[in-house]
Amino acid sequence: MEETVPSKTEPGFAKAIVTTRAALILTADSGSVSIPWERCSERLAHATREERERAELSPSGYGIHWPLIDEDLAVGPLVRSGRLVS
């Protein structure tokens, strides 16, 4: 199951999609980057599907918050650590 988190203010990042294996960050220029949960953080690597699906993009568009596990990650470093998906 996928959960989409739209960006409201960050022009570089359109939305984040949460899948069972990875976070998929979609950019405003139609590119996308896949980041496996193990590369995101230890908390996310061990989180349940429900915990991961509760992702919330920050109002600034620069970060993603997972309230059920109290995890916050900046989108920029996530994108730089990910793999470009064509």
Language model feature labels by segment:
Residues M1-S86:
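Motif-centric detector for short Cys/His coordination patterns
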